[in-house]
């Protein structure tokens, strides 16, 4: 869980911006979206294989 302490004389917008950056860097939101619905192992393997094929192509 990302945690941001609001500094003295820091606006709430700046603290929110730092929080969003830390969440993005940690990959928390992406992980939550990935786990939102169950994905069968066969589908997971297929997606992983297609991603590798796409990376290799480029």
UniProtKB/Swiss-Prot annotation:
Biased composition (Basic and acidic residues): 31-42
Keyword Translocase belongs to the record: no
Secretion signal span: none
Domain of life: Bacteria
Region ranges (Disordered): 25-58
Xref: InterPro entries: Ribosomal_bS21, Ribosomal_bS21_CS, Ribosomal_bS21_sf
Transmembrane segments: none
Any matching Pfam family: Ribosomal_S21
Single GO cellular component term: ribonucleoprotein complex
Biased amino acid composition, Basic residues: 43-58
GO biological process: translation
Keywords: Ribonucleoprotein, Ribosomal protein
GO molecular function list: structural constituent of ribosome
NCBIfam families listed in its UniProt record: S21p (TIGR00030)
Family: Belongs to the bacterial ribosomal protein bS21 family.
Name by which UniProt lists this protein: Small ribosomal subunit protein bS21
Source taxonomy: Bacteria, Bacillati, Bacillota, Bacilli, Lactobacillales
């Amino acid at each position: 869980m990302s945690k941001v302490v609001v500094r003295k004389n820091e606006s709430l917008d700046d603290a929110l911006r730092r929080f969003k950056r830390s969440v993005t860097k940690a990959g928390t939101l992406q992980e939550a979206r990935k786990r939102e619905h169950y994905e069968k192992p066969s589908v997971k393997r297929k997606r992983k294989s297609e991603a590798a094929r796409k990376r290799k192509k480029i």
